[in-house]
Amino acid sequence: IREFYKMYRPAPLVRAYCLEKKLGTPAKIYYKFEGNNTSGSHKLNSAIAQAYYAKKQGLKGVTTETGAGQWGTALSMACSYFDLDCNVYMRTYGAKVTPSPSETTNVGRKILKEHPGTSGSLGCAISEAVEVAVSTEGYRYVLGSVLSQVLLHQTVIGLETKIALDKYGITPDIIIGCAGGGSNIGGLISPFAGEMLRGEKDYQIIAVEPASCPSLTRGVYAYDFCDTGMVCPLSKMYTLGCDFIPSANHAGGLRYHGMSSIVSELYDQGLIEARSVEQTEVFKAAETFAR
């Protein structure tokens, strides 16, 4: 796994000089760029680890879901590297793709019957991918976010960030990350949250989530299923309900009803803040950043 990481890690930590100038702020703004690998996102950090252990276990292949396609792309790459089959359930294209919800699974047919014309959700796709995995010999289901092992794989993001900042004597005041299922924000804040839990330092950590799927800001902290079909084990998290179908938006990877147990616990303890943002606001900010 570490040998594979060497192909694209460490990922660059970049200072946003032009953004600072545009905003007219005295603050120094840095961003961790995880798009420097072939898959284009941080998802490869966990995909390669899970594919490695799947191959070591002697499996034929894996099934999964993906929202925007980042996880599906990353897992497809990792499976190709280890010569594993990869079956992805999503709303658009990827490895071997099955539009979700689909007519190929019991869960998919049930959802389509109850909600004709639905745009689906990550929860729906998870249920379908799990159903195929448990009914196909030599296959297992793997998840690209939410679960604790995925966040542990993603801690490489935060560890690299802290090493780089420490090297130049920089202590961040505010740490911000987008939050869908929790792998991105969880990986980024891991070493900083650890310092806070040990009482060593204090940071302002902000998780930013979509207003159309605001699990932290409008959800309840309870045990809930990780999927719509109620096949997966219960997990304690901030959730909008496993049957919640979010409205369609342009951030497919953020259309998930719940939040990682680790991130949820940190939020419940008051160590991190959460804010929900409309996608139109995000587009405007992205345009400013790009310019």
Q: Which stretches of residues belong to each language-model region?
A:
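Positively charged, low-complexity intrinsically disordered leader regions
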Residues: I1-L59
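Active-site nucleophile and cofactor-binding loops and adjacent substrate-binding regions
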Residues: F33-S46, V62-G72, L147, I176-G181, ...
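Flexible loop/turn segments at secondary-structure boundaries
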Residues: T38-S39, Q70-T73, T105-V107, Q149-L152, ...
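A short, small-residue-rich loop immediately preceding and capping a beta-strand
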Residues: S46, Q57-V88, T171-I185, I205
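A glycine- and small-aliphatic-rich helix-loop capping segment at beta-alpha/alpha-beta transitions
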Residues: A49-Y53, A78-Y89, S190-K201, Y223-T228
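Active-site-proximal loop->helix
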Residues: T63, W71-S119, L216-F225
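Active-site/ligand-binding loops adjacent to catalytic centers
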Residues: K110-Q149, I157, G169, G194-E200, ...
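Phosphate/pyrophosphate-binding loops at sites that engage ATP/ADP/AMP, CoA/4′-phosphopantetheine
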Residues: I163-I170
